[in-house]
């Protein structure tokens, strides 16, 4: 008979550090993960305070990382802002992150459109509407979409 070795449960702080060593997390996201793992709220707050104090947890760094990741996926500013809002990153942190990670949203919209539609301009209104919807879903503004789908783009 084999007995499975079960390691002692890690402390909340150690779990938080382990999660943060893999990738950046926002405060809300880390708190949620620790709660799901069953740690007491007092232990979670203590671990969060430790991680903030030692620079392991930083919402600005997390937001900038998320911006870079979403831009790499071809997402526009609106979609990225919505995702960060869902992760409960504060508006001021989001504004600072966008200021520190400048993007040319018009050119990004154009390159996403080129990749998706192979540079083919819509000949019919129905096809044009389909292209617009795709870019709207990706989080681009109408001005950016118009630029991306225009002939001078």
From Swiss-Prot:
| Protein's UniProt keywords contain rRNA processing | no
Compartment annotation = Cytoplasm
Q: Which domain of life is it from?
A: Bacteria
Example GO CC term: the record gives: cytoplasm
Predominant cellular place of this UniProt entry's protein: cytoplasm
Q: Does the keyword Cytoplasm apply?
A: yes
Sorted alphabetically, the Gene Ontology BP terms of this entry are: regulation of DNA repair
Keyword terms of this UniProt record:
Cytoplasm
Q: Which family does it belong to?
A: Belongs to the RecX family.
* PANTHER family xref list: REGULATORY PROTEIN RECX FAMILY PROTEIN
Indicate what this protein is called per its UniProt record: Regulatory protein RecX
Q: What is the lineage of its organism?
A: Bacteria, Pseudomonadati, Pseudomonadota, Gammaproteobacteria, Vibrionales
